[in-house]
UniProtKB/Swiss-Prot annotation:
InterPro entries: Conotoxin (IPR004214), Contryphan_CS (IPR011062). It holds the Pfam family Conotoxin. Exists in two forms, due to cis-trans isomerization at 56-Cys-hydroxyPro-57. The cis conformation is the major form. This is Contryphan-Bu. The modification Cysteine amide is found at C62. Keywords: Amidation, D-amino acid, Disulfide bond, Hydroxylation, Ion channel impairing toxin, Neurotoxin, Secreted, Signal, Toxin. Belongs to the O2 superfamily. Contryphan family. It is found in: Secreted. Disulfide bonds join C56-C62. The modification 4-hydroxyproline is found at P57.
Amino acid sequence: MGKLTILVLVAAVLLSTQVMGQGDRDQPAARNAVPRDDNPGGASAKLMNLLHRSKCPWSPWCG
């Protein structure tokens, strides 16, 4: 029973350090940054933007 208790304590310590370490990935500049929306028109505008950037061969679709 003593080995199981030690194993549970070690697992809890490892999990808590892993959870605390995940917050360190956030850079100060990224925290204050405004997300850039390249396609404010939604999915259809995103498709048109993709077709336009890739030199779309379908003239009616490319706008």
